[in-house]
A protein has these predicted regions:
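Inter-helical turn/loop elements of alpha-helical hairpins
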Residues: 2-4, 9-75, 86-94, 120-130, ...
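Generic helix N-cap/helix-start motif at coil->alpha-helix transitions
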Residues: 6-11, 38-42, 74-80, 107-114, ...
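Residue at a conserved register position within TPR or TPR-like alpha-solenoid repeats
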Residues: 18, 51, 87, 120-122, ...
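Single-residue signature of alpha-solenoid repeat helices
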Residues: 26, 60, 96, 128-132, ...
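Canonical positions in the second alpha-helix
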Residues: 32-33, 67-70, 102-103, 135-139, ...
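Residue-level detector of the short coil/turn that links helix A to helix B
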Residues: 55, 91, 125-127, 162, ...
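Internal metal/ion-chelating core segments
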Residues: 134-232
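Helix-coil-helix junctions within alpha-helical repeat/solenoid scaffolds
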Residues: 227-420
Length: 420
């Protein structure tokens, strides 16, 4: 496919465009591509990239071996691309990032390689995130402003850097070029969260998702719409959206929604099964990534499972990994303190943590819940002025901030005993 194209004459072109757009048509088209051209290593590699997390290890290994063999026959770029897929599907994110740097030196602005750009942030390392941002900036400049995939990725980078207006403009530019760009609409959702756009954002997301209900990000974008409803104080709509879009086993986004609701004294949406949460924590991948573990902790906090939280905090404090020991442990202790009505202790934990809280993982919109938690703890501890200062940048710049106003509202002693 040519750079920034919006249509394709071959099934391969259409599949690549759908995958770049995170369309619900991507998987059927990729399967059609592989079925019609089983010797195309890139086709098989991209299908494996899209579905590898659901494959058994033996199947994953077999598909990647076939893809790389055929890609080597096609050429060096194809072989390099599939090798990147091999690294990415094996969660070797640092190696993936290092490989992408070399790949882009040889094949600048390669859109299909851009599908793996998330490896830089997945490294959970500030230096790699910065390297990824620099790489995206360079590739977007080389690709030009009419290239919707790279403009969308640049919009995402700008949103995460807090350059919200620029992110918004870039996302709109990408969507003007290709209205079905899932990357661009996701970047727009992040920007509009920080702008407090409210009903205008939810209406746009509803229209966009109606056109492709099978879109890859349907649940995540529905979650963004629920957050906009929370921002406006329409808590019933937030619950409705969460229950309609998020299955009970989707612990992370459901917990992040429910904890926000509880922080402002509202009933949560449907909850996750606590036993399922405990099973996830004890599973081999339960503490593999700090942000995943944090989301499980939020789910426990929603249930006021103080004993589980304290046990998890001790486990994190004994972990040799700095982000677990120095960041996750105090955050989990904060949640435990709030569930037992000890806001002063909770506030002390988070204030001592300071900017290190950024290392909890996730993106800005997701990490904001840590600040929400500190604001609630400060208000419940009688520190309203400090809480207001903490949220001033939000209440003074967001069009809709009913949620922040609720966070800054003192609760009755009974309600202040803790979320849950």
């Amino acid at each position: 496919m040519t750079a920034g194209t919006t249509t394709g004459t071959t099934v391969g072109d259409r599949a690549a465009i759908a995958l770049l757009a995170l369309s619900g048509r991507a998987l059927p088209l990729l399967r059609e591509w592989v079925g019609g051209d089983p010797g195309c290593g890139v086709a098989r590699g991209l299908l494996t990239l899209a579905t590898g997390d659901r494959m058994a290890d033996s199947v994953l290994k077999e598909q990647l071996a076939l893809a790389h063999r055929d890609a080597r026959t096609a050429g060096e770029r194809e072989a390099s691309l599939v090798y990147g897929v091999f690294l990415h599907t094996h969660r070797q994110y640092r190696l993936t990032a290092d490989h992408l740097v070399t790949h882009f030196e040889r094949w600048p602005a390669d859109e299909l390689a851009g599908l793996m750009i998330g490896a830089f942030s997945a490294c959970e390392d500030a230096a790699y995130r910065a390297l990824g941002d620099t790489l995206v900036e360079r590739q977007a400049a080389l690709a030009g402003p009419d290239n919707w995939p790279w403009t969308g990725w640049l919009a995402s980078a700008r949103a995460e850097q807090g350059r919200v207006r620029e992110a918004h403009d870039l996302a709109e530019r990408a969507l003007a070029r290709y209205p079905r760009s899932g990357v661009a609409v996701h970047a727009l959702a992040h920007a509009e969260h920080e702008l407090g756009t409210g009903p205008a954002s939810t209406a746009f997301l509803d229209r966009w998702l109606t056109a492709d209900p099978g879109a890859v990000q349907v649940r995540h974008l529905s979650w963004h719409a629920a957050l906009q409803s929370i921002a406006c104080g329409d808590f019933e709509d937030a619950r409705r959206r969460a229950d309609a879009a998020l299955p009970r086993q989707d612990v992370g986004m459901r917990a992040a929604t429910n904890w926000r609701l509880l922080l402002v004294g509202q009933e949560p949406a449907g909850r996750s099964d606590p036993e399922h949460v405990r099973e996830l924590l004890t599973a081999p991948g339960g503490t593999a990534e700090v942000f995943h573990t944090f989301n499980l902790a939020l789910a426990l906090a929603v249930e006021a499972a103080t004993d589980d939280l304290e046990q998890l905090a001790r486990r994190a404090a004994a972990d040799p990994r700095p982000d677990y020991r120095d960041v996750l442990a105090p955050v989990v202790r904060t949640l435990a303190a709030l569930t037992t009505g000890r806001p002063r202790a909770a506030a002390d934990e988070l204030e001592a943590l300071g900017e290190k809280a950024e290392r909890i993982g996730g993106v800005r919109v997701e990490r904001e819940i840590v600040q929400d938690t500190l604001a609630r703890a400060l208000v419940d501890a009688g520190e309203h002025v400090r809480a207001a200062d903490l949220l001033h940048h939000r209440t003074s710049t967001r069009r809709h901030h009913a949620y922040e106003d609720r966070l800054l509202t003192a609760r009755t002693p009974a309600a202040a005993a803790g979320p849950g």
